[in-house]
């Protein structure tokens, strides 16, 4: 049905308490990053937002996040999913806290929604009032900046973005100089 929450699923969430030096080097970890949290899910955009939430809630950084582009319904194995994210932190407790936030956000937070009755046209329109370190870096914005994250069919996304920007400027929420569109 229209406006159905389509949801996302965590497929795997694992913790490495004391990362191997070789793996740490290949991930270009900082010296204080001793523990890793690794997560896969069936939805990349939701996972990126969830990873960013973890950077605000725990002493962790996103050190790797990549879409595998198999698609949510086309994962190559049961645990592979569409995306992998890796958090790094100083100890297992911080990383576990970060992973807990990621899992919660994927399962209960940001989501794709249906734009039509048979759920065949999904869209993702999520407002982040205060971006953490991960999304602010990706948006080339200061940490704490508000970000609108929009994924939709291309033409509809552009029309929606135009309407949202016009409304935000008209209401005084921002001015044209403060807006960055990242494609």
Model segments located where?
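Conserved mixed alpha/beta catalytic, RNA-binding, or beta-rich assembly cores of soluble enzyme
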Residues: 16-32, 39-51, 55-72, 76-89, ...
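N-terminal basic/disordered segments at the start of proteins
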Residues: 1-22
